[in-house]
């Protein structure tokens, strides 16, 4: 079984980002603070060694961690 590099919550955040949800939208949807959403995004960017949300999305798609 392949283990995801993303936590369940990180995956939920990025699944919303790829459908163009804002940080505020994601926070409301997941019942977490906007700061927590930004932390999840930042953590994923650090794990992947990329700069920016778009770079993280591209890399996660390439790794089949998320899908469109």
Task: Name these PLM-found stretches.
Residues 11-15, 45, 57:
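Hydrophobic residues on short alpha-helical segments
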Residues 1-34:
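Helix-turn-helix DNA-binding segment
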Residues 24, 42, 54:
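Residues within the helices of the helix-turn-helix
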Residues 9, 40-43:
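Residues within the DNA-recognition helix of helix-turn-helix
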Residues 46-68:
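Basic, Lys/Arg-enriched C-terminal extension of HTH/homeodomain DNA-binding domains
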